[in-house]
Amino acid sequence: MATFVQKPAEVEKKWILIDAEGLVVGRLASLIANRLRGKHKATYTPHVDDGDNVIVINAEKAVLTGKKYTDKKYYWHTGYPGGIKERTARQIIEGRFPERVIEKAVERMVPRGPLGRRQMKNLRVYAGSNHPHEAQQPAVLDVAKLNSKNTRSA
């Protein structure tokens, strides 16, 4: 029996909706990364984008554990000499784009390269509870029920 290899034409992508309210960012990002890569499917093939489309709502209400809210720093470089910049998780969450915390966490759990970039395009993160993907009829995934450690009571 030969090893099963999924062909890109055979891929069936589902739409999944996740409410991030009260969920721990790292655990949520790990689950999302696995869904984007398709590792939860029996038809997983490493070189094929066979993951699902994931919609995350209420990203601003996701929770960081420990002192990460105040101490975790996000760095980037402008490209100019001495252009290293940093922001804390608190500044990002309270800023204009709080969904970036979840996006960055997932991005750093997905492989770097052309396939990883293509898989990241299947992730849609929204700070509030509204999203424009009702027509896709996404299936709701209750992450809090999967494991009690996935939530953090404030």
Curated annotation (Swiss-Prot):
Keywords: Ribonucleoprotein, Ribosomal protein. GO terms for cellular component: cytosolic large ribosomal subunit. Transmembrane segments: none annotated. It comes from the Bacteria. InterPro entries: Ribosomal_uL13 (IPR005822), Ribosomal_uL13_bac-type (IPR005823), Ribosomal_uL13_sf (IPR036899). Coiled coil: none annotated. One of its GO terms (molecular function) is mRNA binding. GO terms for biological process: negative regulation of translation; translation. Belongs to the universal ribosomal protein uL13 family. This protein is one of the early assembly proteins of the 50S ribosomal subunit, although it is not seen to bind rRNA by itself. It is important during the early stages of 50S assembly. HAMAP family: Ribosomal_uL13. Part of the 50S ribosomal subunit. This is Large ribosomal subunit protein uL13.
